[in-house]
């Protein structure tokens, strides 16, 4: 009898341990042992048209078409294409959570002309061809064909045809050689058309993976569920003519994914000849402070990878392509690439956080985003003040410190670093949520670097510029609300802000391009 009880007790204990283990496994890191679905489509290996995938996968395609939505905002983000520097006007022109100093900080760089909240991926080519960053007032756009890299799977054809010579071609050369809807970011960007296996089509990502000893065709599926997004949602730069293939895109990840890692990388991978910045990389020189600058691009992948979710194996697809049920109750991955915050039930989050209510989960996201956004505004103001301090010090006519030139080099270095650290978070599209600790730490460092620039400029002028930096920065350097290529052709407009004196007045010109339509002939 006692033996039977003992055996029964041991059996119950064993079952209990199994249950606990199963429960724990359900709450632990996401398994990377995902079974890969196997398909055999009727498509060719070269198929890139989005419409060709619709008959094969109508349910997924229907969800993909939801990327056409352009009216819904979350608290800080959304798909309404407002001007991201305009916190004065209401939607759709501006928005209360805009950053007013963007045009100041990007003065002299095409981003100063237009920078809007992105619409869905289905509009990638349409919005690209209408944006003012590309010169539409001349036959040539003034930017390399590299800019097409993350807009279309047609890149594969173009690179195959032209090889590495493709990258340095003018962006407008391909303006009318593409279907804005059928060739936009879509199925072929991430899937093999014949098997639907996830694949890497990005040249710079392939180059990086190979440099790390990885075969892009033999990666675990869970890793691929993030990397297909990491083809484009990343920081990148274009090679200079002396640094390899001219204008070829490169991911600056050789030293790591954090802003400090990238900043070290950029210090060694450029061809600048400016005193104090020799051999460093710069996207442009800010005309007000004369500082060689780096423009950060949307580093979502780098932000996510060592955050809470990235470290746990939770991928982009888990949150932004969560499972849904079609009308016939079939379970599919949604191809509406959007914020989980647009779902009142927060179902993407509750796949793991099933013990939390939707309201609680939203409140936690907003808690992080508010703290991040408040620091973004603070960091950009200190960055603007740093540019102004260096500008004033450049032109200071009073008695200067003995080490003036060296102090000014150091000041510009801190301007450059402070703005890059701010931009790393500003350009990243989660308002801090992909990695709250990294976002807040990066913005704190940004303010420290920018303040150091101010201190160095003050020291260089023996504090002679102090009186001109005293007071509210919005009064000292007003935010630039409007600036575009047409306005830069107007001499009177160019007198409306003191920083505009460092920009040339553009010659009068008619608009040549409206999307893919040529309006007038242009002389080169």
UniProtKB/Swiss-Prot annotation:
Its EC number is 1.7.2.2. It is a peripheral membrane protein. Residues 29-39, 221-222, 318-331, 351-355 are annotated as: Interaction with NrfH. Residues 1-24 form the signal peptide. The keyword Calcium applies. Catalytic subunit of the cytochrome c nitrite reductase holocomplex NrfHA. Has both nitrite and sulfite reductase activities. Catalyzes the reduction of nitrite to ammonia, consuming six electrons acquired by the electron donor subunit NrfH from the menaquinone pool, in an anaerobic respiratory process of nitrite. The other biological function of the NrfHA holocomplex is to detoxify nitrite. This function is essential for the survival of this organism as it enables it to overcome inhibition by nitrite, which is produced by other organisms living in the same environment. Disruption phenotype: Sensitive to nitrite, but not to nitrate. Loss of anaerobical respiration of nitrite, but the mutant is still able to utilize nitrite as a nitrogen source for growth. Coiled coil: none annotated. GO terms for cellular component: outer membrane-bounded periplasmic space; plasma membrane. Belongs to the cytochrome c-552 family. It holds the Pfam family Cytochrom_C552. It is found in: Cell inner membrane. Induction: Expression is induced in response to nitrite stress. Not induced by nitrate. This is Cytochrome c nitrite reductase subunit NrfA. Ca(2+) 2 binds at residues 235-236, 295, 297. Its cofactor is Ca(2+); heme. Heme 5 binds at residues 309, 349, 352-353. Binds 5 heme groups per subunit. The catalytic lysine-coordinated high spin heme 1 redox potential value indicates that a driving force for a downhill electron transfer is ensured in the NrfH2A4 complex. The record marks 59 as: Interaction with NrfH. It catalyses: 6 Fe(III)-[cytochrome c] + NH4(+) + 2 H2O = 6 Fe(II)-[cytochrome c] + nitrite + 8 H(+). Keywords: Calcium, Cell inner membrane, Cell membrane, Heme, Iron, Membrane, Metal-binding, Oxidoreductase, Signal, Stress response. Heme 2 binds at residues 187, 190-191, 335. One of its GO terms (biological process) is anaerobic electron transport chain. Its main location: membrane.
